[in-house]
């Protein structure tokens, strides 16, 4: 920034619950960058997105600790990483369609923290993606609820990430939250 002050600089990071695991300090990075692009990658399976990462952590806690069941391991994960759990959507169900409550707990919490850690809505430009190689895709309904939650918190723009083809129902959701560009 000192040498090229007119150049806009951004940086990508993980969700707030994963920052301690990945070495990101998004609040500290605010003074070095113009905007942040945290990842709203919530898929599971394959190359794990965040639901998959959470499932892997909880499964590992259970496998490594005799007598620890998945419910207690889930509570431990939530407490250790300041990640709110939705009663209607236990971590053991994370490979299936998410409930509305999950969007008003986990997604709401992590999005609010991302916006705050970025320095406000104007500096928050998240990546939004549905899948990675071999993962379980988010559905059009899940994408709609993620974008609705982001918009309700003042998100003004995002970058859509895709490796594969885009189905019409996904494009319809993206268009629903898109705004025409003024030339």
Where are these regions (language model features)?
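Glycan-processing catalytic domains of CAZymes
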Residues: 1-183
């Amino acid at each position: 920034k000192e040498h090229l002050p007119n150049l806009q600089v951004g940086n990508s990071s993980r969700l707030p619950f994963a920052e301690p695991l990945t070495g990101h300090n998004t609040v500290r990075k605010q003074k070095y960058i113009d905007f942040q692009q945290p990842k709203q990658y919530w898929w599971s399976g394959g190359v794990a997105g965040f639901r998959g990462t959470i499932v892997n952590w909880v499964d590992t806690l259970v496998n490594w600790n005799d007598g620890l069941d998945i419910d207690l391991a889930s509570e431990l994960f939530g407490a250790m990483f300041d990640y709110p759990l939705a009663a209607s959507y236990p971590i053991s169900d994370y490979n299936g369609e998410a409930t509305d409550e999950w969007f008003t707990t986990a997604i709401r919490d992590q999005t609010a923290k991302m916006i705050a850690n970025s320095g406000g809505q104007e500096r928050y430009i998240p990546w939004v993606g549905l899948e990675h190689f071999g993962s379980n895709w988010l559905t059009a309904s899940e994408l709609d609820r993620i974008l609705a939650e982001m918009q309700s918190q003042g998100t003004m723009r995002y970058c859509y990430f895709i490796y594969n083809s885009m189905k019409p129902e996904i494009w319809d959701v993206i268009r629903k939250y898109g705004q025409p560009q003024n030339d």
